[in-house]
A protein has these predicted regions:
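Juxtamembrane extracytoplasmic/periplasmic/luminal helical "stalk" adjacent to the first N-terminal
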Residues: 20-118, 135
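Extracytoplasmic/periplasmic ligand-binding sensor regions of membrane-associated signaling proteins
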Residues: 180-259
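N-terminal membrane-entry
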Residues: 26-30, 364-369
C-alpha cells in the first residue's frame, strides 16, 4: 500500500513538470486522495481484524482454563461434601450407641470430663479415616457439651475433636501425619499425636461458622449442610473454608456439628497459577454480588506471577470477549462461571479465572513487534 502511494506521488510530480490541463490535474488529485483513503481504510481493517483475533484467542485460552478449574472445583467440593455427610452419620451413630449404653442424654455429659474423653475416643477412628482418605487440610467435630459449665464463657465453649494435616503439601505419603488442634490431650497421648502450637481443649462456638445456625432447629430450616465463607482460623495466620454438617441423632436430637476444613495452602497446592503466553492465570472461588467479585469472602489459588491480593474485592465490567476486573491495586481480565455451593447465606458463588491486564497487553504488543 505504501509503495502504491509513493508511485502516485511520482505521477503527481511528473504531472507538475508537464503542461497538463487543470481539469486533468484535479482529476489526478481526486484519484490520489481516493486511493490514499482506501489505503487507510484497508490498514485500519487489517489492524482491527488482528485486534479482534487477539481478543478471541485470549477468550479461548481463558475459557479452556475456566472449564478445567470449574470441573475440578465442582468435583472436589462434591467429594468433600460426601465424606462430610458420611462422617456425620457415623459420628451420630457412635453417640447414639454411647448414650443408649449409658442411658443418658448428651446434656448429661456436661461437667463430665471422662465421659467426654470417651466420646472423643469413639469418634476418633472415623475422623482419622476421613482425613487420611480424602486429605482435606482438617476435619472436625463439635459436640454440644462442655467440660465445665461453671467457668465464665462456658456457654460458647464446646467439647470435640479437630484434627489437622501437619503438612498439606506432602500428599504422597500413604499415611499423612496429623496434629491435634482441639480436643483432649489424653487423645493426643493415646494416638501419639502432636499438639498444635495453638491448641485449645474446646471449641469457641462464637467463631465457628454455622454452629449457632445448625444446632438451632428453627434457624437450620432443614439444611443438611453448607459451606462457609472464608474465615480466619483462630490463633493462626491461616484462612479457611468449612464444610458445616449437623450431627443429628436417631431421635432428632442435635448433637453438634462436623465437617472438613480447606485452608489457603490447600487451594494454593491444588489450584496452581497456569502459565500462558498472555500471563499467569489465577483461579478464584468467591461469591458475586452487585457486579463485585467478593474475593475477601472466597478462596484463591496460587497467585504466582501476579500481584492479586486476596484481601481486596474486584469490580466487574462485562465485555464482549471477556470481563474486566478492577481493584485499587490494578486490573485483570478474565471469565467466570457460576457454581452451586449451598451456603449459610444465600450467596451466588462463581469460579473465576483471571490474568493481569498489563501482562497480556505487553504480550500482545511484543508479538506484534
Amino acid at each position: 500500500m505504501i509503495k502504491k502511494i509513493k508511485e502516485l506521488g511520482q505521477i503527481i510530480y511528473l504531472a507538475r513538470k508537464k503542461n497538463i490541463p487543470m481539469r486533468k490535474k484535479l482529476m489526478l488529485y481526486l484519484c490520489t486522495m481516493v486511493m490514499a483513503g482506501l489505503g487507510i481504510v484497508c490498514l485500519l481493517l487489517v489492524l482491527t481484524r488482528n485486534l479482534f483475533g487477539t481478543h478471541k484467542q485470549i477468550q479461548d485460552v481463558l475459557q479452556m482454563q475456566l472449564d478445567s478449574s470449574t470441573a475440578q472445583m465442582q468435583e472436589d467440593l462434591e467429594q468433600y461434601t460426601g465424606y462430610g455427610l458420611s462422617l456425620s452419620g457415623q459420628i451420630s451413630q457412635n453417640i447414639d450407641n454411647q448414650l443408649k449404653n449409658n442411658a443418658k442424654k448428651l446434656t448429661d455429659y456436661n461437667d463430665d470430663q471422662e465421659a467426654l474423653i470417651e466420646l472423643q475416643r469413639q469418634i476418633y477412628p472415623e475422623m482419622n479415616t476421613t482425613i487420611q482418605i480424602c486429605r482435606p487440610s482438617g476435619v472436625y467435630a463439635v459436640l454440644d457439651a462442655t467440660v465445665n459449665t461453671k467457668i465464665s464463657g462456658s456457654e460458647k465453649s464446646r467439647s470435640g475433636l479437630y484434627l489437622r494435616l501437619k503438612n498439606v503439601t506432602n500428599t504422597g505419603n500413604l499415611m499423612a501425619e496429623t496434629i491435634l488442634f482441639r480436643g483432649s490431650p489424653d487423645i493426643a497421648r493415646e494416638k501419639e499425636l502432636e499438639l498444635h502450637n495453638r491448641w485449645n481443649l474446646e471449641f469457641n462456638t462464637d467463631v465457628m461458622p454455622g454452629y449457632h445456625t445448625l444446632v438451632d432447629e428453627k434457624k437450620r430450616k432443614g439444611m443438611s449442610y453448607f459451606w462457609s465463607e472464608k474465615t480466619s482460623l483462630t490463633g493462626t495466620w491461616e484462612d479457611v473454608m468449612f464444610l458445616c454438617v449437623p450431627i443429628i441423632g436417631n431421635s432428632g436430637d442435635i448433637y453438634g456439628q462436623c465437617g472438613v476444613e480447606l485452608n489457603s495452602m490447600y487451594f494454593n497446592q491444588n489450584y496452581t497459577a497456569v502459565d500462558s503466553k498472555y500471563g499467569s492465570m489465577v483461579t478464584i472461588l468467591a461469591p458475586v454480588s452487585d457486579q463485585i467479585l467478593e474475593v475477601q469472602k472466597g478462596m484463591t489459588g496460587s497467585t504466582d506471577g501476579t500481584w492479586l491480593q486476596s484481601v481486596e474485592d474486584l469490580k466487574i465490567n462485562h465485555k464482549k470477549y471477556y470481563n474486566e476486573y478492577f481493584s485499587g491495586q490494578g486490573e485483570f481480565i478474565g471469565l467466570q462461571k457460576e457454581i452451586q455451593i449451598p451456603g449459610e447465606k444465600e450467596n451466588r458463588w462463581v469460579v473465576a479465572v483471571l490474568l493481569p491486564k498489563d501482562k497480556w497487553q505487553a504480550s500482545v504488543w511484543r508479538n506484534r513487534n
